[in-house]
């Protein structure tokens, strides 16, 4: 249930989505596995902002994505941050951008404003153009 300060504006967004997109909420086959439901890459997480990528990746898992990668714009991966979410796979942003098996991308969650963040974004936009 999502709410607003105005009681008349509250709505159950999942129920609304189920009505608008019934295929997304159909029961999954017993013979399926996480690879059946696509691979999402969430790129961002500059130093000190790892939580943004983890939150987005966690939301993707709850939303039904199959495999979810979290790509961090940091020299060292924040393994401690991800300890509670072992189902989310880790990589640096550069490692993740080199993968060819990603079905969809999310870029910018906690990416920051530094030069390395700009390079990550430029690389991501180039990849999107090349793979379109």
Q: What does each of the following model-derived ranges do?
A:
Residues 1-132:
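Small-residue (G/A/S/T)-rich helix-start motifs and N-terminal tracts that mark the onset
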């Amino acid at each position: 249930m999502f709410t607003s300060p105005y009681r008349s504006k509250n709505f159950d967004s999942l129920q609304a989505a189920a009505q608008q997109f019934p295929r997304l909420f159909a029961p999954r086959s017993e013979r399926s596995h996480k690879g059946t439901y696509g691979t999402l890459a969430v790129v961002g997480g500059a130093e000190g902002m790892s939580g943004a990528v983890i939150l987005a990746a966690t939301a993707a898992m709850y939303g039904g994505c199959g495999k979810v990668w979290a790509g961090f714009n940091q020299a060292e991966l924040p393994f401690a941050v991800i300890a509670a979410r072992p189902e989310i796979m880790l990589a640096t942003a550069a490692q993740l951008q080199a993968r060819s098996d990603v079905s969809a991308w999310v870029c910018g969650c906690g990416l920051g404003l530094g030069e390395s963040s700009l390079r990550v974004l430029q690389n991501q936009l180039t990849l999107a153009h090349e793979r379109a």
